[in-house]
Structure formats: structure tokens, C-alpha cells
């Protein structure tokens, strides 16, 4: 993970660690003019590693975004941001997106009162995301909420930390997307 972060820059969804000061002598020899191919590849890899997608999954999202009305890039980012694992990460119920994926896979999360065990589940406006009533599920979420730094919550989400409940108000606005893509 740290190699990826060093190469691509900070990826908040992958890990909370930050790259070093940049005094790596190997890196200086590789600097120079970056080709268009390299720039596009790095931006694509940022998306893949940040959201934890395979190449095939990303291509499928690009295909869906291309068919939709509006800017393909913006629609793609909206699709990725509305995934259940990413929404759990944005709500602060998990420290990283892989951590959120694990919570979903282990069946700790309910969407509108139903267990959802698919991390790529596409949330819609007015979806209510809660934890299972089991003590273990609530304890896991409580630890994440207590330990996470309270960053500003995007305006398309609201959270009730006492009931461990999140609400999707609307589709994400472009200014709230946490990843800087060129």
C-alpha cells in the first residue's frame, strides 16, 4: 500500500498514512516530462486503488457513465461515491474503504432494514444505513466513530452517531468528491 501511495500521492480511502518528505533519491531520477499516457494511467490507478476496484469493475463503471447524460468523468465519480463501502467510509463508520468493505462482507450493515453484503451496492437518495442490532456490530462501528478524526461530513450525507445511523440525502455534489483527479 505504501508503495502505491508514494507513487500516486495521498489516497485517503486506501490508508490514513501519508507519503514521506520526498527525499527519496530513486524518485528524482525518474522525474522529468510526464507523457499523456503516464498521466492518464496514474489517474486511472488512483481511482482503482482509492475505491478498491479491479480493472474490470472500473471499465464497467466507465461504460455505465458513458451511457448516462452529462459529463462522463463527473458521472463516473458520482457512481463510485454512491457505493455502499464508500458511503460508510465518508460517514466515518470505517477508517478506510477496505475496512468498510469488510464490515459489509461480514454482514454488519443494514440498508433500509435489510442486510446488504455487497460492498458495491449502489445507494440511492433517502437510503438509511444502520448497523445490525447485535452488540458486536455496534461495538465495531462505535470504535471507528470514536477513533476517526471528525472531518466535515459531505452535504449529501447525515449521521446520527448515537443510533449508528446514516442517511443518504441526495446524489453527491462534485465539490464534495474527496479525491483529486486530473
Swiss-Prot record:
Residues 8-36 are annotated as: Disordered. Gene3D superfamilies: Ribosomal Protein S4 Delta 41, Chain A, domain 1, RNA-binding S4 domain. Residues 82-143 form the S4 RNA-binding domain. PROSITE patterns: RIBOSOMAL_S4, S4. It comes from the Eukaryota. Keywords: Chloroplast, Plastid, Ribonucleoprotein, Ribosomal protein, RNA-binding, rRNA-binding. One of its GO terms (molecular function) is rRNA binding. It is found in: Plastid, Chloroplast. Signal peptide: none annotated. The keyword Ribosomal protein applies. One of its GO terms (cellular component) is chloroplast. Its main location: plastid. One of its GO terms (biological process) is ribosomal small subunit biogenesis. One of the primary rRNA binding proteins, it binds directly to 16S rRNA where it nucleates assembly of the body of the 30S subunit. With S5 and S12 plays an important role in translational accuracy. Belongs to the universal ribosomal protein uS4 family. Part of the 30S ribosomal subunit. Contacts protein S5. The interaction surface between S4 and S5 is involved in control of translational fidelity. This is Small ribosomal subunit protein uS4c.
Amino acid at each position: 500500500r505504501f508503495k502505491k501511495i508514494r507513487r500516486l500521492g495521498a489516497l485517503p480511502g486506501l490508508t490514513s498514512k501519508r507519503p514521506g518528505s520526498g527525499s527519496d533519491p530513486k524518485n528524482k531520477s525518474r522525474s522529468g516530462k510526464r507523457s499523456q499516457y503516464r498521466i492518464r494511467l496514474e489517474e486511472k490507478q488512483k481511482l482503482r486503488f482509492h475505491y478498491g476496484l479491479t480493472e474490470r469493475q472500473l471499465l464497467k463503471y466507465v461504460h455505465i457513465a458513458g451511457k448516462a447524460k452529462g459529463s462522463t468523468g463527473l458521472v463516473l465519480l458520482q457512481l463510485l461515491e454512491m457505493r455502499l463501502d464508500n458511503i460508510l467510509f465518508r460517514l466515518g463508520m470505517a477508517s478506510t474503504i477496505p475496512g468498510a468493505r469488510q464490515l459489509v462482507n461480514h454482514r454488519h450493515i443494514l440498508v433500509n432494514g435489510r442486510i446488504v453484503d455487497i460492498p458495491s451496492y449502489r445507494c440511492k437518495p433517502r437510503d438509511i444505513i444502520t448497523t445490525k442490532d447485535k452488540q458486536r456490530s455496534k461495538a465495531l462501528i462505535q470504535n471507528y466513530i470514536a477513533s476517526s478524526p471528525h472531518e466535515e461530513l459531505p452535504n449529501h450525507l447525515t449521521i446520527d452517531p448515537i443510533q449508528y445511523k446514516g442517511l443518504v440525502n441526495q446524489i453527491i455534489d462534485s465539490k464534495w468528491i474527496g479525491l483529486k483527479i486530473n
